[in-house]
């Protein structure tokens, strides 16, 4: 409880510091990365964090782990950013480790970590996934932004894809779409323009939300949506193939308890 309270305080402080530094960065630079980070933090990460905290207070430290953005250590010209990043980035990575360890403990001590409808997405037997999340954050902690899009964000988005938002239990997004919103909007070396990317994000999210997945509908479950979305994005060269592999593993883990329960009911 004390750790959760400390995380709440740090979130409030970090929001103020983060947005103040980003406002200065956006005012002094027109780089794509600065605008995309401000967009992701204002319109995507903060609402998702607070919605999850209200709907599932027991996972506050996990929500904190999913919320924290990273400030790039260099600006568009390759020069070092202001000294505020020297303080914020290590704190961000440290609390990410706390959030990962919280999920690891819940996976070890609980029979069902993330329930969805009448099934369970992550059980206590999924220690291998929890270990992967912990190792990913450790690698990020010691190596910095080089492992961001390959390991650290995979761990965060695989978890966040299966967290229910709202009292009705309707889930928003999937692994592929969430990862796309986090990373592709900030890529500057892509051959496509930012406007095309923004249109693709809007159309993908609107198509997912228009389907309104119900808790009893297994065909519209987040792992299945994430799998097919990641297939599309990988074929369009928006995502690395490692994301498709992670979504495939999550899809197999999702289908395994359903197949076992169906076979048990038939017998």
Curated annotation (Swiss-Prot):
Q: Which UniProt keywords apply?
A: Membrane, Signal, Transmembrane, Transmembrane helix
Where does this protein reside within or beyond the cell?
Membrane
- Bilayer-crossing residues are 125-145, 165-185
List S-S links within the chain.
none
Tell me a GO cellular component. membrane
Signal peptide positions on this chain: 1-27
Membrane association type:
Multi-pass membrane protein
Task: Give any extra note attached to this record.
Answer: Partially overlaps IES1.
Return the protein name: Putative uncharacterized protein YFL013W-A
């Amino acid at each position: 409880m004390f750790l959760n309270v400390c995380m709440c305080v740090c979130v409030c402080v970090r929001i103020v510091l983060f947005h103040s530094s980003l406002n200065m960065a956006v005012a002094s630079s027109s780089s794509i990365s600065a605008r995309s980070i401000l967009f992701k933090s204002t319109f995507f990460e903060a609402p998702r964090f607070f919605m999850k905290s209200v709907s599932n207070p027991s996972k506050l430290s996990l929500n904190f782990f999913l919320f924290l953005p990273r400030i790039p250590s260099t600006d568009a010209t390759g020069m070092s950013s202001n000294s505020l990043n020297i303080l914020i980035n290590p704190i961000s990575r440290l609390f990410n480790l706390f959030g990962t360890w919280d999920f690891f403990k819940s996976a070890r001590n609980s029979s069902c970590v993330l329930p969805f409808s009448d099934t369970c997405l992550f059980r206590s037997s999924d220690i291998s996934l929890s270990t992967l999340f912990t190792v990913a954050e450790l690698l990020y902690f010691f190596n910095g932004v080089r492992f961001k899009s390959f390991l650290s964000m995979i761990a965060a988005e695989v978890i966040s894809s299966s967290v229910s938002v709202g009292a009705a239990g309707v889930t928003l997004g999937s692994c592929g779409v969430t990862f796309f919103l986090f990373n592709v909007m900030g890529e500057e070396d892509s051959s496509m323009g930012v406007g095309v990317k923004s249109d693709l994000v809007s159309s993908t999210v609107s198509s997912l939300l228009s389907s309104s997945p119900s808790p009893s509908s297994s065909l519209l479950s987040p792992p299945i949506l994430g799998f097919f979305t990641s297939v599309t994005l990988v074929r369009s060269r928006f995502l690395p193939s490692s994301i498709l592999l992670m979504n495939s593993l999550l899809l197999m883990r999702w289908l395994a308890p359903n197949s076992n329960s169906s076979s048990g009911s038939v017998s």
